[in-house]
């Protein structure tokens, strides 16, 4: 009899987004006339930049000629893409990152989970609360936690609350932890970390031999000057941090699939016998064994992001979604609903009005406004009493959704 991975049985019933989809489908079936506006899952809506489309079309044509046909690509991704990434995303910000330290992949979500393949099972892991559910669930699947308690918190994880009181930036752990997940700009709260805050984390990690897993998927949305876009802008980060990036939310690649992970060659981890091993070699071995790379066509599209035209077009996309976020923030504030985020991130973190729970507010929005958000409690117990709205939508949908919410919640009185 084949045995299953019993750790999957510890997962809370239903991943957050499938549960949202289930409720929305049930409502849509019962009310087929309803025009539902989905502002929950952070999927982009606007077309791929023209520069990317043109590059991909050209690459398709190359695949039709024997002389320019490409088969399996390099395990880390093509050098021309990695060079462009290193030059534009890191070296331009005085980050000491080389193209050889970049691994191209088909998604930062995948990499955030797959990185656990090279880490041991006895690490103490710290996550913020609320948090992107993938960080938690992949550790549960890998057997790094015990069961969940009645609050949905897993034994073995160290939860670091991020609240309005601490400006949605967690304090350093009071105990020693081995692995730390940080996401800035933050999903779901939209908060950013100052240089000083990140320096504190880097100093902590170096003092305790900890590893920071830094998710920078939304760095392109940072508008405030002086806010770091990369953990490697912080002195000492090369010795303690891995960074995840994605083209999904910057260049609209959610359906095209391209991302990258940075593993500095100076980064070390400890083996069971006490020896030190460089994580770059482990990650290279893992990727070479389990991943065949991103398609040549998609990598050419990603390379075009760094062209002059591509940079202008991507900036246009980012500004479009940030304007959506501004509209959401402004309209909700005008009817007395407290909001956070949406300035340096495409997400607006909404305080539920009238003492409603996260799921109660979700259901009220769905049933009375025909608008879908993401319940804050789905991101962790500290997210209870909040709901995330995504700016990834058409301008018409955002304006209509805010009109509907405004008509229902005028004078909600949730300003804090």
UniProtKB/Swiss-Prot annotation:
<dbReference type="InterPro" id="IPR015421">
    <property type="entry name" value="PyrdxlP-dep_Trfase_major"/>
</dbReference>
<dbReference type="GO" id="GO:0010285">
    <property type="term" value="F:L,L-diaminopimelate aminotransferase activity"/>
</dbReference>
<keyword id="KW-0808">Transferase</keyword>
<protein>
    <recommendedName>
        <fullName>LL-diaminopimelate aminotransferase</fullName>
        <ecNumber>2.6.1.83</ecNumber>
    </recommendedName>
</protein>
<feature type="binding site">
    <location>
        <position position="218"/>
    </location>
    <ligand>
        <name>pyridoxal 5'-phosphate</name>
    </ligand>
</feature>
<keyword id="KW-0663">Pyridoxal phosphate</keyword>
<feature type="binding site">
    <location>
        <position position="257"/>
    </location>
    <ligand>
        <name>pyridoxal 5'-phosphate</name>
    </ligand>
</feature>
<keyword id="KW-0032">Aminotransferase</keyword>
<dbReference type="Pfam" id="PF00155">
    <property type="entry name" value="Aminotran_1_2"/>
</dbReference>
<feature type="binding site">
    <location>
        <position position="15"/>
    </location>
    <ligand>
        <name>substrate</name>
    </ligand>
</feature>
<feature type="binding site">
    <location>
        <position position="292"/>
    </location>
    <ligand>
        <name>pyridoxal 5'-phosphate</name>
    </ligand>
</feature>
<feature type="binding site">
    <location>
        <position position="187"/>
    </location>
    <ligand>
        <name>substrate</name>
    </ligand>
</feature>
<feature type="binding site">
    <location>
        <position position="187"/>
    </location>
    <ligand>
        <name>pyridoxal 5'-phosphate</name>
    </ligand>
</feature>
<dbReference type="GO" id="GO:0030170">
    <property type="term" value="F:pyridoxal phosphate binding"/>
</dbReference>
<dbReference type="GO" id="GO:0033362">
    <property type="term" value="P:lysine biosynthetic process via diaminopimelate, diaminopimelate-aminotransferase pathway"/>
</dbReference>
<dbReference type="InterPro" id="IPR015422">
    <property type="entry name" value="PyrdxlP-dep_Trfase_small"/>
</dbReference>
<dbReference type="InterPro" id="IPR019942">
    <property type="entry name" value="DapL/ALD1"/>
</dbReference>
<comment type="subunit">
    <text>Homodimer.</text>
</comment>
<feature type="binding site">
    <location>
        <position position="42"/>
    </location>
    <ligand>
        <name>substrate</name>
    </ligand>
</feature>
<comment type="pathway">
    <text>Amino-acid biosynthesis; L-lysine biosynthesis via DAP pathway; LL-2,6-diaminopimelate from (S)-tetrahydrodipicolinate (aminotransferase route): step 1/1.</text>
</comment>
<feature type="binding site">
    <location>
        <position position="132"/>
    </location>
    <ligand>
        <name>pyridoxal 5'-phosphate</name>
    </ligand>
</feature>
<feature type="binding site">
    <location>
        <begin position="246"/>
        <end position="248"/>
    </location>
    <ligand>
        <name>pyridoxal 5'-phosphate</name>
    </ligand>
</feature>
<feature type="binding site">
    <location>
        <position position="292"/>
    </location>
    <ligand>
        <name>substrate</name>
    </ligand>
</feature>
<comment type="function">
    <text>Involved in the synthesis of meso-diaminopimelate (m-DAP or DL-DAP), required for both lysine and peptidoglycan biosynthesis. Catalyzes the direct conversion of tetrahydrodipicolinate to LL-diaminopimelate.</text>
</comment>
<feature type="binding site">
    <location>
        <position position="132"/>
    </location>
    <ligand>
        <name>substrate</name>
    </ligand>
</feature>
<feature type="binding site">
    <location>
        <position position="72"/>
    </location>
    <ligand>
        <name>pyridoxal 5'-phosphate</name>
    </ligand>
</feature>
<feature type="binding site">
    <location>
        <position position="109"/>
    </location>
    <ligand>
        <name>substrate</name>
    </ligand>
</feature>
<dbReference type="InterPro" id="IPR004839">
    <property type="entry name" value="Aminotransferase_I/II_large"/>
</dbReference>
<comment type="similarity">
    <text>Belongs to the class-I pyridoxal-phosphate-dependent aminotransferase family. LL-diaminopimelate aminotransferase subfamily.</text>
</comment>
<dbReference type="InterPro" id="IPR015424">
    <property type="entry name" value="PyrdxlP-dep_Trfase"/>
</dbReference>
<feature type="binding site">
    <location>
        <begin position="108"/>
        <end position="109"/>
    </location>
    <ligand>
        <name>pyridoxal 5'-phosphate</name>
    </ligand>
</feature>
<feature type="modified residue" description="N6-(pyridoxal phosphate)lysine">
    <location>
        <position position="249"/>
    </location>
</feature>
<feature type="binding site">
    <location>
        <position position="388"/>
    </location>
    <ligand>
        <name>substrate</name>
    </ligand>
</feature>
């Amino acid at each position: 009899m084949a045995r299953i991975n019993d750790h999957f049985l510890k997962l809370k019933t239903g991943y957050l987004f499938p549960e949202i989809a289930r409720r929305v489908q049930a409502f849509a079936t019962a009310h087929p006339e309803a025009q539902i506006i989905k502002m929950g899952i952070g999927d982009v809506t606007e077309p791929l930049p023209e520069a990317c489309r043109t590059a991909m079309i050209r690459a398709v044509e190359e695949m039709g000629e024997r002389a320019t046909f490409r088969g399996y690509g390099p395990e880390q991704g093509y050098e021309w893409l990695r060079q462009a990434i290193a030059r534009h995303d890191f070296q331009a910000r005085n980050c000491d990152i080389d193209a050889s330290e970049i691994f191209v992949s088909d998604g930062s979500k995948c990499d955030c989970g797959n990185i656990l393949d090279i880490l041991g099972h006895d690490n103490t892991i710290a996550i913020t609360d609320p948090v992107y559910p993938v960080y938690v669930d992949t550790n549960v699947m890998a057997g790094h936690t015990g069961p969940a308690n009645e609050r949905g918190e897993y034994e073995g994880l160290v939860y670091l609350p991020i609240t309005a009181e601490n400006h949605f930036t967690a304090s350093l752990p009071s105990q020693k932890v081995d692995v730390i997940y940080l996401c800035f700009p933050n999903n779901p709260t939209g908060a950013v970390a100052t240089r000083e805050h990140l320096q504190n984390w880097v100093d902590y990690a170096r003092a305790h031999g900890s590893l920071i897993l830094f998710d920078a998927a939304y760095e392109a949305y940072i508008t405030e000057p002086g806010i770091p876009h990369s953990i490697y802008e912080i002195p000492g980060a090369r010795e303690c941090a891995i960074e995840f990036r994605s083209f999904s939310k910057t260049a609209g690649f959610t359906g095209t699939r391209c991302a990258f992970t940075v593993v500095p060659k100076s980064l070390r981890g400890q083996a069971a016998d006490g020896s030190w091993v460089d994580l770059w070699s482990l990650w290279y071995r893992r990727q070479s064994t389990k991943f065949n790379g991103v398609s040549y066509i998609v990598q050419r599209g990603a390379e075009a992001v760094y062209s002059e035209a591509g940079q202008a077009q991507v900036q246009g996309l980012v500004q479009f979604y940030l304007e959506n976020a501004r509209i959401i923030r402004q309209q909700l504030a005008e009817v007395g609903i407290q909001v956070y985020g949406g300035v340096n991130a495409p997400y607006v973190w909404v305080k539920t009005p009238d003492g409603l729970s996260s799921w109660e507010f979700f259901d009220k929005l769905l049933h009375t406004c025909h608008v879908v958000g993401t319940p804050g409690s789905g991101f962790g117990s500290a997210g209870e009493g909040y709901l995330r709205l995504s700016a990834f939508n058409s301008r018409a949908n955002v304006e209509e959704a805010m009109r509907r919410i405004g008509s229902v919640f005028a004078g909600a009185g949730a300003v804090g």
